């Protein structure tokens, strides 16, 4: 989290927000029933170590919910090098199996995988589709000129974004 974001949450929502590394937070010996990590696992250079540290922060029956994309999804395989989540600041890519193994090796049992559709403006969707499917650029250019379409929100479900639900296994 940014300092600005942490302060905003503290001041406006009266939340206990910690803006520090996991290593520093572990020293406080605080345990949690639930930890949520939304769209962050792919940014860690050593996600295996992060899961080990998260395990230490969970109570005995603690839960971990994390969201990330499944690199083995049909959509990711179909788009290949044009897959829109292959970007420089994503350091690691996961499959369902990889996360299951990482979890088990860190006393976290993968209990459930849920599809995680997102919503976006039609204008943004057209921009992205133009990058992924450049041969259809003529069609996307026509659609992008229809102003009222740009701000319509659409549900996008490519079956590649997932919510992973883990439960801590006794130490």
List each model region and its residues:
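Conserved SAM-binding loop
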Residues: 1-78, 93-106, 161-168
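Short secondary-structure boundary/capping segments
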Residues: 7, 56, 83, 154-155
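Generic structural signal for residues in well-ordered beta-strands
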Residues: 17, 110-113
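Short N-terminal micro-motifs specific to bacterial/archaeal maturation
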Residues: 41, 90, 115-116
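Short glycine/proline- and charge-enriched loop/turn segments
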Residues: 79-87, 126-133
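Acceptor-substrate binding/catalytic loop of class I
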Residues: 83-97
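A C-terminal cap/extension of S-adenosyl-L-methionine-dependent methyltransferases
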Residues: 112-171
């Amino acid at each position: 989290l940014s300092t600005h974001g942490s302060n905003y949450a503290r001041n406006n929502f009266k939340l206990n927000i910690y803006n520090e590394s996991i290593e520093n937070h572990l020293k406080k010996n605080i345990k949690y029933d639930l930890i949520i990590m939304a769209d962050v696992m792919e940014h860690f250079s050593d996600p295996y170590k992060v899961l080990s540290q998260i395990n230490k922060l969970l109570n005995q029956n603690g839960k971990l919910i994390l969201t990330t994309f499944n690199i083995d999804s049909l959509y990711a395989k179909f788009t290949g090098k044009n897959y829109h989540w292959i970007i420089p600041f994503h350091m690691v890519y996961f499959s369902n199996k990889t996360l299951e193994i990482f979890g088990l090796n860190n006393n976290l049992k993968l209990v459930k995988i849920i599809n995680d559709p997102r919503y976006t403006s039609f204008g943004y969707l057209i921009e992205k589709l133009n990058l992924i499917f450049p041969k259809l650029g003529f069609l996307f250019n026509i659609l992008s000129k229809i102003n009222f379409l740009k701000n319509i929100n659409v549900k996008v479900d490519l079956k590649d974004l997932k919510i992973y639900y883990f439960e801590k296994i006794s130490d």
